[in-house]
Amino acid sequence: MDSNTVSSFQVDCFLWHVRKRFADRELGDAPFLDRLRRDQKSLRGRGNTLGLDIETATRAGKQIVERILEEESDEALKMPAPRYLTDMTLEEMSRDWFMLMPKQKVAGSLCIKMDQAIMDKNIILKANFSVFFDRLETLILLRAFTEEGAIVGEISPLPSLPGHTDEDVKNAIGVLIGGLEWNDNTVRVSETLQRFAWRSSDEDGRPPLPPNQKRKMARTIESEV
């Protein structure tokens, strides 16, 4: 049995015990108590699968947590703050642009725009966004630029629909790339986006998309105005 699996179960058991003590003092709200009940069932199932006694695992988990806390400073216990990363300058973010053949699609809480009159261009995607725990947290603005600096596409959050995940952003980027590539443009993304928006990309700095997916994405954005 993998040692990480065992220690993870032990720590989960102890943390559940701490939460149970908290609830016993009538300090937990309804969602807290609901999660406590669901997690209890989950721990019982995991204990049966692993063949481990929950009470014994709880004691072992307490020792693990105590060792960790002994090594932690007060500074380390602070919640890390999001980092704000910028591919674009203020001028690039605030510049007005227009489309000869405008196409627009709303995907969840993100709005995707592109100019389908653009053909046979080398295009780079740049974005300004915040990062939390080394993952994209909030997209501020993403724009597609030609080598000449013209803006030909954009992804922006909708003010009326706040909240999006890194997967939402990744999917929106895929739609934008598919639409631009439909017109024989070559699209790549900035190194910053490669690092935080997705974990795998090809040598051209863009996520690998099979031809059938690119065609599907292009048709999707083609049908939305």
From Swiss-Prot:
It is found in: Host nucleus; Host cytoplasm. It comes from Influenza A virus (strain A/Chicken/Hong Kong/715.5/2001 H5N1 genotype E). Residues 1-73 are annotated as: RNA-binding and homodimerization. Homodimer. Interacts with host TRIM25 (via coiled coil); this interaction specifically inhibits TRIM25 multimerization and TRIM25-mediated RIGI CARD ubiquitination. Interacts with human EIF2AK2/PKR, CPSF4, IVNS1ABP and PABPN1. A motif (Nuclear export signal) lies at residues 132-141. One of its GO terms (biological process) is symbiont-mediated suppression of host type I interferon-mediated signaling pathway. One of its GO terms (cellular component) is host cell cytoplasm. Keywords: Eukaryotic host gene expression shutoff by virus, Host cytoplasm, Host gene expression shutoff by virus, Host mRNA suppression by virus, Host nucleus, Host-virus interaction, Inhibition of host innate immune response by virus, Inhibition of host interferon signaling pathway by virus, Inhibition of host PKR by virus, Inhibition of host pre-mRNA processing by virus, Inhibition of host RIG-I by virus, Inhibition of host RLR pathway by virus, Interferon antiviral system evasion, RNA-binding, Ubl conjugation, Viral immunoevasion. The keyword RNA-binding applies. A motif (Nuclear localization signal) lies at residues 34-38. Its main location: host cell. Upon interferon induction, ISGylated via host HERC5; this results in the impairment of NS1 interaction with RNA targets due to its inability to form homodimers and to interact with host EIF2AK2/PKR. This is Non-structural protein 1. The dsRNA-binding region is required for suppression of RNA silencing. GO terms for molecular function: protein serine/threonine kinase inhibitor activity; RNA binding.
